[in-house]
């Protein structure tokens, strides 16, 4: 019976693992003459090359250093007059706020509650839990955050109809009781809006504005046209609403928010004349959501009548304009160019990885390609000192045999029998000599193969030629 080999101790296995950790691996280049595999390899390389050349370098301009979010300054000015049923309105009345910043509102409809004074009056019927039948239904001193004043505890008739509501102490009459509506949008589409915008990219020390370098009379006679006059930033309000895809009359009655987006995408490798603003317009508030669509706000005008403080409450519906500026500037830089070139060259290796996987998974009959692909070379064993060899020569005895890897002849004999050994002899695999060694192994990860060759012969690279016909195809 064959003696059972004891399992290697843990310490020995750890030493073997530590020794294997310091092994060096280097690629081995083999040429596989296979047309379908070559087509796949070149196709993958071509796709990767097109991706980097067209998308990365041409579209994304990855060879440039870039900066996003320019420093921006915006000044706006509105001009025009309009009229309601009984009044003419000018800019000072329908533009809020009047400072001319990046966000402003143009009032297109108002609901006016005039001559409000401090007193007691019926609460609005739209306030929750305000309808009543008796005074007991109203709690004196109660303050509703959604109401218009402090409840007095009385139940009084409403402004119109037969309903009753709780009486409150505050500004009277309340908004529902005496509000009058005025439409200001009749001439509003012809309002003109001047938008002055200047941007600065600090990384590249580049600045530019959206107004052409001309005299002062230029802005008095021009209007914006993206094709013919892009540096005249004077827009008609009707043009802005139309470009946003909205109906002006509907928007003027309910109000809404329109965004004027100015985009500065600049390629600073080109002259500054190629860096031009691009304008786009869209509605920003969700018009299809009834609970949040529209735009309105309230303000009041105070005055005194017969020594009594009086105010006019105005609920204003309007078109709010938000001017939004964004952009990106890019300029050639060596560092991102080198990084992206290195990434491109490295990514081409994906084709080799894919083809290796196809080769070794689907085309590796009889492990022909594995034997050619993987080799493991062991360093020749050297004695720690020459005194055993010298002593043996003096005594006339054979020197001690060196420790070396198993010969390919021996491995071939064990693996495939005498016939494989004869094939190994025909390929030049001889018995190793004890003094000149060149060890290697093919497709045998846990064993090293030693091979002795004369000094004039080069070592063979493939030690297990199991299929000569398959090897001839490589």
From Swiss-Prot:
Activity regulation, per record: Fast activation by external ATP. Exhibits slow desensitization during prolonged ATP activation. Not sensitive to the ATP agonist:alpha/beta-methylene-ATP.
GO biological process, one term: sensory perception of sound
Enzymatic reactions: Ca(2+)(in) = Ca(2+)(out); K(+)(in) = K(+)(out); Na(+)(in) = Na(+)(out)
Record field: compositional bias (Polar residues): 453-466
Residue positions the entry lists as glycosylated: 129, 190, 247, 306
Stretches for region Pore-forming motif: 316-329
Disulfide bonding pattern of the chain: 121-172, 132-155, 138-166, 222-232, 266-275
Transmembrane segments: 43-60, 334-354
The keyword Nucleotide-binding is assigned to this record: yes
GO molecular function terms listed in the Swiss-Prot or TrEMBL record: ATP binding; DNA-binding transcription activator activity, RNA polymerase II-specific; extracellularly ATP-gated monoatomic cation channel activity; purinergic nucleotide receptor activity
GO cellular component: apical plasma membrane; plasma membrane; postsynapse; receptor complex
Cytoplasmic side: 1-42, 355-474
Alphabetically ordered keywords of this record: ATP-binding, Cell membrane, Disulfide bond, Glycoprotein, Ion channel, Ion transport, Ligand-gated ion channel, Membrane, Nucleotide-binding, Receptor, Transmembrane, Transmembrane helix, Transport
Coiled coil: none
Pfam families reported in the protein's UniProt record: P2X_receptor (PF00864)
Binding site for ATP: 77, 79, 192, 292, 296, 298, 315
Subcellular localization, as worded in the UniProt entry: Cell membrane
Domain of life: Eukaryota
Tissue specificity remark: Express in organ of Corti.
PROSITE patterns associated with the record: P2X_RECEPTOR
Side of membrane Extracellular, spans: 61-333
Disordered, as annotated region: 445-474
Annotated family: Belongs to the P2X receptor family.
Quaternary structure, from the entry: Homotrimer and heterotrimer; functional P2XRs are organized as homomeric and heteromeric trimers. Homotrimer. Forms heterodimer with P2RX1. Forms heterotrimer with P2RX6. Forms heterotrimer with P2RX3.
Name of this chain's protein: P2X purinoceptor 2
């Amino acid at each position: 019976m064959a003696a059972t080999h004891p399992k290697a101790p843990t310490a020995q296995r750890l030493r073997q693992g530590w020794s294997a950790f310091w092994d060096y691996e280097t690629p081995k280049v083999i040429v596989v003459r296979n047309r379908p595999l070559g087509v796949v390899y070149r196709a993958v390389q071509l796709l990767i090359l097109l991706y980097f050349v067209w998308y990365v370098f041409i579209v994304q301009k990855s060879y440039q250093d870039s900066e996003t979010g320019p420093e921006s300054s915006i000044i706006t000015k509105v001009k025009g007059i309009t009229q309601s049923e009984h009044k003419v309105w000018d800019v000072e009345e329908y533009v809020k706020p009047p400072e001319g910043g990046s966000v402003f509102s143009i009032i297109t409809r108002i609901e006016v509650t005039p001559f409000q004074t401090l007193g007691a009056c019926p609460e609005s019927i739209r306030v929750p839990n305000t309808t009543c039948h008796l005074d007991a239904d109203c709690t004196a001193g109660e303050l509703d955050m959604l109401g218009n004043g402090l409840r007095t505890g009385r139940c009084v008739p409403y402004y119109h109809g037969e309903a009753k509501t709780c009486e409150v102490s505050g500004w009277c009459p309340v908004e529902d009781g005496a509000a009058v509506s005025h439409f200001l949008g009749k001439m509003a589409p012809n309002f003109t809006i001047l938008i002055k915008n200047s941007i600065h990219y600090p990384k590249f020390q580049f600045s530019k504005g959206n107004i052409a370098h001309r005299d002062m009379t230029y802005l008095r006679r021009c209007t914006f046209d993206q094709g013919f006059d892009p540096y005249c930033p004077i827009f008609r309000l009707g043009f802005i609403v139309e470009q946003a895809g909205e109906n002006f009359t509907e928007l003027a009655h309910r109000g809404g928010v329109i965004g004027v987006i100015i985009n500065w995408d600049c390629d600073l490798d080109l002259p500054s004349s190629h860096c031009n603003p691009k304008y786009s317009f869209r509605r920003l508030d969700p018009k299809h959501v009834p609970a949040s669509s529209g735009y309105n706000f309230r303000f009041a005008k105070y005055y005194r009548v017969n020594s009594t403080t009086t105010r006019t409450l105005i609920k204003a519906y309007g078109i709010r304009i938000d001017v939004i500026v964004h952009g990106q500037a890019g300029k050639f830089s060596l560092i991102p160019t080198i990084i992206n070139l290195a990434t491109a060259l490295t990514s081409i290796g994906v084709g080799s990885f894919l083809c290796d996987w196809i080769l070794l998974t689907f085309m590796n009959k009889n492990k022909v390609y594995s034997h050619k692909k993987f080799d493991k070379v062991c360093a020749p064993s050297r004695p720690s000192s020459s005194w055993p060899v010298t002593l043996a020569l003096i005594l006339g005895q054979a020197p001690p045999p060196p420790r070396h890897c198993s010969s390919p002849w021996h491995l071939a004999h064990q693996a495939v029998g005498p016939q494989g050994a004869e094939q190994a002899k025909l390929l030049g695999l001889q018995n190793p000599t004890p003094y000149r060694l060149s060890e290697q192994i093919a497709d045998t990860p846990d064993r090293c193969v030693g091979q002795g060759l004369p000094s004039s012969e080069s070592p063979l690279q493939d030690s297990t030629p199991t299929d000569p016909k398959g090897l001839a195809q490589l």
